[in-house]
Design a protein with these regions (language model features):
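Compositionally biased, intrinsically disordered low-complexity regions
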Residues: 4, 49-51, 70
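Conserved PLP-enzyme active-site core in the AAT-like
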Residues: 1-47, 133-134, 161
Length: 236
């Protein structure tokens, strides 16, 4: 494509989880003319195997952590080899899924950016908060009761009560419709049963944390049952 340097986000398109499901990875690829200046040592072929090449006179030298999460790179590389040109088809379906959800939810949540999206789009619970006191956090917590992992919330920061929706290419239409129904049900509950949303999740083993108490009285050290155990850990 004519680029000198390309940064790959291995999240999603190249198989890696993201955020709490991470780790992600961001390898950087360069043209051959730039390769001599890369951090050293470089991994180079040596017969049937590989070796570290330290003889790099033009290299910028060692860079802390420059190899990154190596296992992530291997997994993504294998993923690319396995799917080949089908990666484009997978990306097309991810974009289609995102626009399908956008079209089905735009009438019940605020839509800060009213246009076709790529692989993700942003909704806002601004009206729910203004009219019923229900926040993006409440929506996310209630989704857990529907068996759905909550989306990223409060990002981007410029969108109040943001909900970033990012379906993948692997979701069936039935699962997409299930997500839509859950989101629409939650919007209806905001008007009829706001306190239910404020207490959500109600069916999970772990309930909602008391965020006010956590902020005012944080517990940053584990409370041991036996003083000897605490002393052993502190002294190594």
């Amino acid at each position: 494509m004519g680029f000198d340097v390309v940064h790959y986000n291995l999240h999603k398109t190249f198989s890696q989880p993201h955020g709490g499901g991470g780790p992600g990875g961001g390898p950087v690829a360069v043209r051959a003319e730039i390769e001599p200046f890369l951090p050293s040592p470089l991994v180079v072929r040596a017969g049937d195997g590989f070796r570290l090449d330290h003889d790099r006179p033009k290299s910028i030298g060692r860079v802390r952590g420059f190899a990154g999460p190596f296992g992530v790179f291997v997994r993504s590389y294998a993923f690319m080899l396995a799917y080949g040109t089908a990666l484009k088809d997978m990306s097309d379906v991810a974009v289609l899924n995102a626009n399908y959800l956008l079209a089905r939810l735009r009438d019940v949540y605020d839509l800060p950016y009213d246009r076709l999206c790529l692989h993700e789009f942003v909704l806002s619970a601004r009206t729910l908060k203004r009219e019923h006191g229900i926040t993006a956090l409440d929506v996310a917590k209630r989704l857990m009761d529907h068996g759905i992992h909550p989306p990223t919330i409060y990002f981007p920061l410029v969108v109040p009560e943001a909900l970033m929706i990012e379906p993948t290419e692997t979701e069936t239409k039935e699962r997409l419709d299930g997500f839509v129904e859950a989101m629409r049900s939650i919007a209806a509950e905001a008007a009829s049963e706001p306190e239910t949303l404020k207490r959500a999740p109600l069916t999970r083993p772990v309930r909602r944390l008391d965020e006010v108490k956590a902020a005012k009285d944080p517990v940053v050290r584990h409370a041991f049952d036996h003083p000897a155990e605490a002393a052993r850990i502190e002294t190594g």
